[in-house]
Amino acid sequence: MANHKSAEKRARQTIKRTERNRFYRTRLKNITKAVREAVEAKDVNTANEALKLANKSIHSFVSKGFLKKQTAARRVSRLAQLVNTLKAA
């Protein structure tokens, strides 16, 4: 248990940040999973919609400081490549 006022505040902040990061991490996994499942099902329309949502969400995570800019770009790029393989086939 914290003995100083500043340590107590830090403990509270850590709990809040952990919860927030868990929410973002789960959301990121679910969004990515939706795109991958749509591609596996060979559903072009659903894959495009999921990719659009993923792109929007991932870039919003950058503005909130959860992801770095290059990490977000890489993730979106890989998902787009995956969807484009569906269009080519």
From Swiss-Prot:
GO cellular component entries: cytosol; small ribosomal subunit
Molecular functions per Gene Ontology: small ribosomal subunit rRNA binding; structural constituent of ribosome
Entry coiled-coil feature ranges: none
InterPro entries associated with the record: Ribosomal_bS20, Ribosomal_bS20_sf
Any Pfam family the entry gives: Ribosomal_S20p
Protein function: Binds directly to 16S ribosomal RNA.
PANTHER family: 30S RIBOSOMAL PROTEIN S20, SMALL RIBOSOMAL SUBUNIT PROTEIN BS20C
UniProt family annotation: Belongs to the bacterial ribosomal protein bS20 family.
Protein's name in the database: Small ribosomal subunit protein bS20
Organism taxonomic ancestry: Bacteria, Pseudomonadati, Campylobacterota, Epsilonproteobacteria, Campylobacterales
